[in-house]
């Protein structure tokens, strides 16, 4: 049974989050949580929250066992970009791009939805 969790408009660029996501793709959930807890990046905290949400969804909605869950799909898409200006010398201004991302985690315990 597949269970999905999403975090939209995460305040980190998709490029930075993908570095962390690539570490845990295809791993068992307990191992992935262990890797994320020792990864020293802001994106690791964001991804860990989404993964824990997916696990809670699987446990509550589908009655899945946490130890059997595996990350089947995990991907990061670009979100909307907020445009800001930074004043510079001689009356000029630079554009600052505050990038966001959408993090999606899909976990599965290996059973099909029709097996119930």
From Swiss-Prot:
Matching entries from Pfam families are given as: Ribosomal_L22
Q: Which PROSITE patterns match?
A: RIBOSOMAL_L22
Checking Gene3D superfamilies in the record gives: Ribosomal protein L22/L17
Question: What does the entry give for GO biological process?
Answer: translation
Function according to Swiss-Prot or TrEMBL: This protein binds specifically to 23S rRNA; its binding is stimulated by other ribosomal proteins, e.g. L4, L17, and L20. It is important during the early stages of 50S assembly. It makes multiple contacts with different domains of the 23S rRNA in the assembled 50S subunit and ribosome. The globular domain of the protein is located near the polypeptide exit tunnel on the outside of the subunit, while an extended beta-hairpin is found that lines the wall of the exit tunnel in the center of the 70S ribosome.
Q: What is this protein called?
A: Large ribosomal subunit protein uL22
Q: Which domain of life is it from?
A: Bacteria
- What GO CC terms are in its UniProt record? cytosolic large ribosomal subunit
Family under the similarity heading: Belongs to the universal ribosomal protein uL22 family.
The answer, when asked if Ribonucleoprotein is one of the entry's keywords, is yes
Q: How does it assemble?
A: Part of the 50S ribosomal subunit.
Q: Which UniProt keywords apply?
A: Ribonucleoprotein, Ribosomal protein, RNA-binding, rRNA-binding
